């Protein structure tokens, strides 16, 4: 086994997996899967690794031994005792962060609060600066409702929660848009001038 080196991705083979076949779910391996995730988190926390890359896992088998498991993001937050986490999907052309994760669609609107938006944008802004070396990130926020609520005509979340959060963040000199309509947010112009979307 090689030690941690720059420009090296180390793949660690952890044994004790029950026999498997591709395309089949084995609840008997739930503990094995969770132990692998725990090991990877521990290695990263103790600075033995510089990053953690997770592959997909079957939530159904994990839930068989941990009823509160909803996904990597929330699990890592629990293990690390972090105040806040943010899931971001990133490529060279596009970065999209999620305000909510792993909850039923019926619960999304009541989960969107001023505090949640402020917390997520602060994490996003900080990570764009520290992890992506962007000095003054430009962040655009999508509305929750069609056409960003049309000033309260198609839902009130933008007026009650999202806009007040964004006004608060602007006072802290965070370069952020007001809520955009999701159907037009990813225009060529917006893609060119935006470092990340929430």
Give the location of each predicted region.
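Anion-binding alpha/beta catalytic cores of soluble intermediary-metabolism enzymes, centered on
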Residues: 1-197
